[in-house]
Amino acid sequence: MKKSVIGSLLALSLVLLFAGSAFAVDINLSVAASLREVVTELSDTFAKSHAGVTFQNNFGASGVLAKQIESGAPADIFFSANLEWMDYLKERKLLDEKSISTFAHNVLVFVGKPESKVTRLEDVIKLEKIAIGSPKSVPAGEYAMQAFNKAGIDKQLENKLVMARDVRECLLYADRGEVDGAFVYKTDAEEMAKNVKILFIVQQDLYPRVTYPMALTPEGSKKAEAIAFLKFLQSAEAKSVLAKHGFVVN
């Protein structure tokens, strides 16, 4: 009798285990580094109301993430910090084109020590070391280079630039005093800066508007939960969270 009861309980446990596994779904997100906090908050909110859904978040430079996806890294939704890397994957048929949409917008700023006399773009040529994200893979760095070129100061800055792997590392260099200032996004400066402050906002006519597109990958388009999460990201609730973190949502 005792063995029978134990056997029944064991069988029931296995049934419950496999039933739970059947409803468990991982959603893999590849996310531009500057979206770390807001996407983490939004994915946590979604998971709380969708039993069995868990998120695997991969944060980094948009170009690095795109190359990872191209190489077969698991990803259901890609969030880029510019249109270029979204187009890169679209051209390679690695995105569900119909799902491409705008997640948010941002602004490029320059941060430095509070006592700094730098108040405009032309002033940065007086500095010795300036951090930007590597333009080859970091959109913030590419935006900065475009601003330098348009302002006609690119030649004066070329030997002063310190390249960072992503925009967060760029901010960290400035915060630790390893550079005299850094070009980062406004949201990063407002949320993460400890020892530096925003010295000026880069004129919008000097670089393309910072746009964060998002899209499902072919794998993600097969997951109902990933599709539902993408829809949630376009909701009024999600936009309220984006605005709270300093992003522009229109």
Predicted features, each with a name:
Residues 1-7:
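Positively charged n-region of N-terminal signal peptides that target proteins for export
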Residues 23-49, 54, 58-59, 63, ...:
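Exported/periplasmic ABC-transporter solute-binding proteins
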Residues 8-19:
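Bacterial N-terminal signal peptides
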